[in-house]
Curated annotation (Swiss-Prot):
The record marks R555 as: Arginine finger. This is TBC1 domain family member 9B. The record marks Q594 as: Glutamine finger. It comes from the Eukaryota.
């Protein structure tokens, strides 16, 4: 490539001059190419350690003048061919012109101008593609692709200098972190180390420091442990590695690949060595941290942050911290964790103004809101720019949010308005955060009753607080405490959140304020206000729609807090149904998961349907990520954290719990339902209060406190059942003595009776103990532990999926368990490669975790073609892609252009582990429909229908049993998806109302079992065109075999014999008076000994050294006897339905002469002369003149039994098909191609001399 000219002071230090003229020098890097000796090794080592560009471009051209000592680089090249092209251009276009100049300065100026012009011309047509990466970074990306053979689609994120510990020796080199791979390369004095690890294969990633490895990063895969150290900035490197591994786990979890953020703004000053991808990932990390800290919606993007102070009127202090600005919010977080948090939605802002600066208050900024609150920030570094950014965002904010914000905010400031709320104008408007229960609607106004306020108010007797005695007084005091807090710290979204707020939450939220504060602390209020009418729209869309999720919802509705009166009534049940169905419709990835019904029923007790819906959104999508999906990954991750915390805080108990296996049993129910399913309702709801304020750390603290309180009893337990019973009784007796609601006994407590109940435990005391003993947990630490556990959990689930898939493969498939697992990993890698590099962008090709394990990974025809070429024992040279396409169509039973692992293994097994008959059956079917390509289907219809004798009633015998192990629902899914409109709805309705009983499944199972009872007599007959294709395939298969000549002789003999059998069968059927187009049946077949044996002898190819055979050519036209072999190369007079059109375009594109026929005598034809487009036709009564201008004989046909019997007469063919091939070596080679596992190469460079 041409380079912008740069000075080079020392031209010959590490370079060898190969060509020169008075103005230019072509040089090669020392050590590149052959030899190089010790100098070459040293130069190569320097290039790697110093990251020299000479690794990518070992050739260069310098401009020089005779009297000057300075050289200028004008071009470089990665190959001799590339650099020679540039050299020749310079010689042809510049040499004569340069000789005219007198001044050397003019020569140099002219050359530099010319090179700059060439570069500008080349770049003129290049479209700008987002952020341009720095030149040094582009060079590193080229090195990475060249060194590791990565495609253009693999993007480099960053690269770092480090050492890889190979044994006890550190190898200095470069670590390349790409979107999908971790790569390392080192070259030191002839020793080369190359590593490639897929992020999806990593099972452990941690930063540690030991005596052996000072500050190192450990990377574990299923096969090995890798250690990297001596980083310049190990913290940055590890953080980026964590992020990339997280992206890979997310891809395994839900197939969400990495997509660049096109909306990321360009930097004002381009960073020198930071790529656009690195900036993108850094921005993502900051956005995620920002959203998690302030509980903001998932689409909120951080614009920037700056240091400042905030004036807090409640304690008259200036609190230092950070201000964060995003599209819709201004947030503040104090440096001290509990000092103050603040969230100001821009929709609430009325005035932003710069106040007067003073020595006490430098650069102040005042922000006023609609709720009459004013916030004063100071010590802002760039106040003018900040005000401008806020103004820009305010201009984009709608001036009036739907839902009457102003009227609701009046009640936020003045709590007295809560007692007399004004009715809303429409059901789509969300309620006030200060009074979420205020919206009342007449139930008779709608066809279905809608819970427009918390169900607790509707189903609880409205007795005055005075009648409740001490409990009522305590509740009144709580309300007063919160109202005082609101007066001092503000009410609503803009509340100052301090340590005092947490203290009030721990004392319990009064029931009248619970729904409001849940909405505020969870961030659900922000989403509800910004999406007015969204829930009502979802309810309308989802009404009457049936799916698997709605069926599961209906099944669980009556299991949701059945002990509570609100859910013993149709009003509560209907509200719960609408909320769960609306969420399943909003998020089909989750749909519905068990335990969502229990949590949602509690949310409905304290809020309207819309509020409960948005609280559920906050819970499922932000606060408990990945909890409520088919594999409850999030809960399993937190279960792993719980086990780790138990080891840290309760080491005595940890080992005992592991032995009993209790943690895995208890933690899922505790975490998924937030203790609601294991504690009395009035106690568990206090934990939910703290959860919405603090997050998952409260659940973990309480779980540890429960184990700590029962340590002695647990240590004395002998089995899991005893431990579970003891813990269950303890939790049943956790009481809330301050609750004003009538006590609702826990369902399990009602069903179990005990003469010796344990002592009651106060829930507030349990919370107090949990904070005293385990409050050292921090949100950042939990996120770090979540990453570590997520790797383990997802890889464990992947291993479970692999075992499940392997178990679903029938035992008679022939492969061992290890071979099946290796094949599965290769198959999975091919699928993932399509996700990495966009080979398969169709939604059908993407992984769907909701499908059965067997159907989750599928590959398309192009991916299968690559796997087939590398794994098949039937190597056919250039014919292999055609054979692979036929095999794919044969295995693709449901015609969705994708095959799963079971179908793939079935095809492989037929080639590797079948006996002679089974292998020939596979080969035979590859030349019959459905192996014909879709393009061939129309032209092949007539012949296929005739030759298969009602092919529509016969399924592919090889693929007929492929779905035996799939559930009936999976088999039904495809036809339903293909239909559209009302038809699919009707089917869905039928499915929702009546499901098939067990007899239906038994009938289906019996039908599938019957399909396996296929004999060779059931195979359809093969016509002449198909037989010719079979012969071509066999000739190609034998081309690379050591017994090539013997196999050619044998197949020539068999082919001529079968051709004559077909001819005789056709004549015999004609004599018996059958229809002329009928094929010969098994009874019509004449005995083989009656055929002329001398004809078969004539058809055998001569020896390779026979000179007559080479000289014969096709000069013997018309001289062949009746038993001669006819070579047909095409025909132009065929009709539309002729069998010659059964070939696809790919199979006929190499035809040399489509309209000519030539008859070659048997003696003059060699096996080497048979091209791909050569077909063999022969017969006793078939004269060459009858064929000229005609078509391939459509009445000719032959059966599989005849082919099998003929091949059995040739021992060399029998030995070829019975030969055992080890698939292990082919799998190993394919793994290297796919880079399925970490591969480390340690090579010595040859020829160290001098």
């Amino acid at each position: 490539m041409w380079l912008s000219p740069e000075e080079v002071l020392v031209a010959n230090a590490l370079w060898v001059t190969e060509r020169a003229n008075p103005f230019f020098v072509l040089q090669r890097r020392r050590g590149h190419g052959r030899g190089g000796g010790l100098t070459g090794l040293l130069v190569g080592t320097l290039d790697v350690v110093l990251d020299s560009s000479a690794r990518v471009a070992p050739y260069r051209i310098l401009h020089q003048t005779q009297d000057s000592q300075v050289y200028w680089t004008v071009a470089c090249g990665s190959s001799r061919k590339e650099i020679t092209k540039h050299w020749e251009w310079l010689e042809n276009n510049l040499l004569q012109t340069l000789s005219i100049f007198d001044s050397e300065e003019d020569i140099t100026t002219f050359v530099k101008g010319k090179i700059h012009g060439i570069i500008a011309e080349e770049n003129k047509n290049l479209q700008p593609q987002g952020d341009e990466d720095p030149g040094k970074f582009k060079e590193a990306e080229l090195k990475m692709r060249k060194q590791f053979g990565m495609p253009e689609g693999e993007k480099l994120v960053n690269y770092y200098s480090c050492s890889y510990w190979k044994g006890r020796v550190p190898r200095q080199g470069w670590l390349y972190l790409t979107v999908n791979h971790l790569c390392f390369y080192s070259f030191l004095l002839g020793k080369e180390v190359s590593l490639v690890v897929q992020w999806v294969d990593i099972t452990r990633l941690e930063k540690n420091a030991t005596l052996l490895f000072p500050e190192s990063i450990r990377v574990d895969t299923r096969d090995q442990e890798l250690f990297f150290s001596m980083f310049l900035n190990i913290g940055e490197t590890f953080k980026l590695m964590e992020q990339l591994a997280n992206l890979a786990m997310r891809q395994l979890l839900d197939s969400e690949g990495f997509l660049e953020d096109k909306a990321l703004p360009r930097p004002i000053r381009p960073h020198r060595n930071i790529s656009a991808l690195k900036r993108d990932l850094d921005a993502r990390a900051k956005n995620e941290c920002y959203r998690a800290t302030f509980r903001l919606p998932r689409d909120e993007r951080l614009d920037g942050h700056t240091s400042c102070t905030l004036w807090t009127p409640f304690n008259k202090l200036h609190i230092p911290g950070q201000m964060f600005i995003s599209n819709n919010y201004i947030c503040f977080a104090s440096k001290e964790e509990d000092a103050c948090h603040l969230i100001i939605p821009l929709r609430e802002v009325t005035i932003v103004e710069k106040a007067d600066s003073s020595s006490v208050l430098p650069s102040p900024l005042s922000i006023s809101t609609k709720s009459k609150m004013t916030f004063l920030f100071a010590n802002l570094k760039d106040r003018d720019f900040l005000v401008q950014r806020i103004s820009d965002f305010l201009q984009k904010t709608p001036s009036k949010q739907p839902g009457s914000i102003g009227s609701r905010k009046a009640s936020v400031v003045d709590p007295s308005t809560e007692s007399s709320p004004a009715p809303q104008e429409g059901s789509e408007q969300p309620a006030s955060p200060a009074s979420p229960l205020s919206s009342r609607q007449s139930f008779c106004a709608q066809e279905a009753p809608t819970a427009s306020q918390g169900l607790l108010k509707l189903f609880q007797k409205n007795s005055p607080m005075e009648d409740l005695g001490a409990k009522g007084a305590k509740e009144k005091m709580k309300e007063e405490s919160w109202h005082i807090h609101f007066f001092e710290y503000g009410r609503g979204v803009c509340m100052y959140r301090t340590a005092k707020t947490r203290a009030l939450v721990l004392k319990g939220i009064p029931e009248s304020l619970r729904g409001e504060l849940w909405l505020l602390f969870s961030g659900a209020w922000n989403e509800m206000v910004t999406h007015p009418g969204y829930y009502a729209e979802l309810v309308e869309k989802s009404t009457g729609k049936y799916s698997l999720a709605t069926e599961e919802i209906e099944r669980d509705l009556h299991r949701s807090m059945p002990e509570h009166p609100a859910f013993q009534n149709e009003l509560g049940i209907a509200a719960l149904r609408r909320v769960l169905t609306a969420y399943a419709f909003r998020n089909p990835t989750i749909g519905y998961c068990q335990a969502m019904n229990i949590v949602t029923s509690v949310l409905l007790l304290y809020g309207s349907e819309e509020e409960a819906f948005w609280l559920l959104v906050a819970l499922c999508e932000r606060m408990l990520p990945d909890y409520y999906n088919t594999r409850v990954v999030g809960a399993l991750v937190d279960q792993g954290i719980f086990e780790e915390l138990t080891r840290d805080f309760l080491p005595q108990l940890s080992e005992k719990m592991q032995d009993l296996g209790v943690i895995s049993s208890i933690s899922l129910s505790w975490f998924l339902t937030l203790f609601l399913s294991v504690m009395p309702f009035e106690s568990a709801v206090v934990i939910v209060d703290c959860f919405f304020y603090e997050g998952i750390k409260v659940i973990l603290q309480v779980a540890l406190a429960v184990l700590d309180a029962n340590m002695e009893q647990l240590l004395g337990c002998s089995d899991e059942g005893e431990a579970m019973t003891m813990l269950g009784r303890y939790l049943d007796n956790v009481v809330n003595k301050q609750s004003v609601s009538p006590p609702i006994p826990h369902l399990r407590a009602l069903l179990s009776s005990s003469d010796d109940p344990p002592a009651e435990v106060d829930i507030f005391e349990l919370l107090k103990v949990s904070y005293e003993k385990f409050s050292s947990l921090r949100a950042e630490d939990i996120e770090q532990m979540r990453f570590k556990q997520r790797l383990k959990v997802i890889q464990s689930l992947e291993d479970t999926a692999k075992r499940s898939v392997v178990r679903a493969i029938p035992v008679d498939i022939g492969f061992s368990i290890e071979e099946l697992e290796d094949l599965y990993m290769v198959f999975k890698a091919k699928h993932l490669a399509s996700q990495y590099w966009g080979c398969s962008r169709t939604m059908a090709g993407r992984r769907d975790p909701s499908l059965p394990y067997l159907e989750q990974y599928r590959i398309d025809a192009s991916q299968f073609r690559e796997l087939f070429a590398s794994l098949t024992p039937w190597a056919c040279g250039s014919h292999t892609p055609l054979l692979a396409g036929r095999m794919f169509r044969l295995l693709d039973e449901n015609k969705d252009s994708l095959i799963n692992f079971k179908e793939f293994v079935t095809g492989m097994s037929g080639m590797y582990h079948g006996d002679l008959t089974e292998k020939l059956k596979v080969l035979y079917k590859l030349h019959l429909p459905p192996a014909l390509s879709p393009e061939e289907a129309e032209s092949a219809l007539e012949a296929a229908h005739y030759f298969t004798e009602d092919s529509s009633s016969e399924a592919s015998p090889l693929a007929s049993d492929l779905d035996l192990f799939l559930p009936w629902e999976a088999q039904e899914a495809l036809p339903q998806e293909e239909q559209e409109g009302s038809g699919s709805e009707e089917r869905g309705e039928e499915k929702g109302t009546s499901s098939p009983d067990y007899r239906h499944y038994l009938r289906m199972w019996a039908k599938e079992k019957e399909a396996q009872k296929e004999t060779i007599k059931d195979l359809p007959k093969m016509n002449q065109e198909q037989f010719i294709e079979l012969c071509k395939t066999l000739y190609n298969m034998f081309s690379e075999d050591p017994m090539e000549q013997d196999l050619y002789h044998a197949i020539a003999t068999v082919a001529s014999l079968l051709l004559r059998i077909g001819e005789v069968g056709k004549k015999f059927s004609a004599r018996t008076g059958r229809k002329p187009r009928d094929c010969a049946t098994e009874e019509d077949e004449p005995p083989a000994p009656e055929l002329h044996q001398d004809a078969a002898r004539e058809l055998q190819p001569p020896a390779a050294g026979d000179p007559q055979a080479k000289a014969g050519g096709d000069t013997h036209l018309g001289k062949a006897p009746q038993e001669s072999q006819v070579v047909v190369e095409g025909g132009s007079g065929e009709g539309q339905g002729s069998p010659s059109q059964l070939l696809s375009d790919d199979e006929t594109k190499d035809d040399m002469s489509m309209s000519s026929y030539s008859v070659v005598s048997t003696g003059s034809l060699q096996c080497e002369d048979l091209a791909d487009d050569t077909v063999l036709v022969g017969g006793e009564a078939c004269s060459p003149t009858a064929r000229i201008g005609g078509t391939v004989d459509t009445d000719w046909c032959i059966s599989f039994e005849q082919i099998l019997a003929s091949i059995l007469t040739e021992s060399v063919l029998v030995n070829f098909f019975e030969k055992r091939v080890d698939i292990g070596l082919k799998i190993k080679d394919q793994k290297k191609v796919e880079r399925q596992f970490s591969t480390a190469s340690d090579h010595e460079q040859p020829g160290v001399s001098g």
